[in-house]
Every structure is written in structure tokens, then in C-alpha cells.
């Protein structure tokens, strides 16, 4: 394997870990209802006064944390092929479910804005998260089987 391919795979893995940390941060922030650090206030992603499904929001937060834990698995060190295939299938399903969650979030925020007679914000953050979530599938596949890149 060429050195630049190995380096790109390492960068992809670092992106996966950073994305996992972001998912844990988003999940914890949603579970505790925002963070106040002196003058810095990080609100939850959903306004509790507007959203009336707290169980669904908690489930989404726990899903983010579980998805992040799945990203932290040592994918290259899993020796058993059946275990790796099963976990990879789980990662594929979880990544697609994560993308579906982001699409549903955009639709819900548009619906809330429409009911308030406002214009919805452009969903840049959700789009970035969607593509990062779907990008985990090839990152882990090629970190396990780099010969497929050639």
C-alpha cells in the first residue's frame, strides 16, 4: 500500500474520532438541556418550549451517543471476520439511520418555522452531519481493506 494511501486512511480515522466526539457532545448537550460556562451558553439543538416530544429528543440524544461509541471501535484490530462483518453491517444501518435523523430534523424545523410564519434557516449543520455520517461507511471499509482503493 502506498504511503499516501495509508496516510489518508489515518486522516479518515481521525475524522471518525472527531465526529464521534462531536456526536457525544451533541447527545450530552441535548440530555442536560444546554451548557452554561460563564458567559458562554450553548443551547440545546431543540427549543424545549417548541418541541412537545421530549421522549423522542432523549432517544435521539442516546442514539447519538451510541452511534459515537460505534465509531470508536478499533475497526482495524478486529480479527474475527464474522464479528467485523456484523459490526460493519450495524455501522451501515446506524449511519443510514443517522442520515435519516438529520433529514427528519430539517423537515421538522421547516414545519415549526412554517407554523410560526417564519422562514426556516438553511440546514448547513445538518447537511454536514449527514455527509459525515454517511462517510463513515467507506472510511471503515477502506481502513479494513485498503486494497479496494486501488
Q: Over which residues does each language-model region extend?
A:
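Cytosolic juxtamembrane helix and N-cap/initiation of the first transmembrane helix
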Residues: 1-25
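Membrane-water interface at the C-terminal end of transmembrane alpha helices
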Residues: 127-149
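Non-cytosolic membrane-interface motifs at loop->transmembrane helix junctions
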Residues: 112-125
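Hydrophobic transmembrane helix segments
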Residues: 21-62
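Juxtamembrane helix-break-helix junctions at the cytosolic face
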Residues: 5, 69-93
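Hydrophobic alpha-helical membrane segments
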Residues: 86-105, 126-132
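Core segments of alpha-helical transmembrane spans in multipass integral membrane proteins
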Residues: 51-75, 93-96
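Juxtamembrane "helix-exit" motif on the non-cytosolic side of transmembrane helices
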Residues: 35-39, 103-112
Amino acid at each position: 500500500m502506498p504511503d499516501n494511501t495509508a496516510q489518508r486512511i489515518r486522516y479518515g480515522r481521525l475524522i471518525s474520532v472527531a465526529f464521534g466526539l462531536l456526536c457525544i457532545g451533541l447527545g450530552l448537550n441535548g440530555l442536560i438541556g444546554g451548557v452554561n460556562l460563564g458567559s458562554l451558553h450553548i443551547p440545546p439543538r431543540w427549543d424545549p418550549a417548541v418541541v412537545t416530544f421530549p421522549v423522542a429528543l432523549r432517544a435521539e440524544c442516546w442514539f447519538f451517543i451510541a452511534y459515537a461509541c460505534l465509531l470508536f471501535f478499533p475497526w482495524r484490530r478486529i480479527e474475527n471476520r464474522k464479528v467485523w462483518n456484523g459490526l460493519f453491517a450495524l455501522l451501515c444501518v446506524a449511519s443510514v439511520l443517522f442520515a435519516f435523523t438529520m433529514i427528519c430534523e430539517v423537515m421538522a424545523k421547516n414545519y415549526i418555522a412554517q407554523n410560526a410564519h417564519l422562514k426556516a434557516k438553511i440546514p448547513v449543520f445538518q447537511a454536514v452531519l449527514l455527509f459525515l455520517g454517511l462517510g463513515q461507511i467507506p472510511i471503515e471499509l477502506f481502513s479494513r481493506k485498503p486494497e479496494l482503493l486501488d
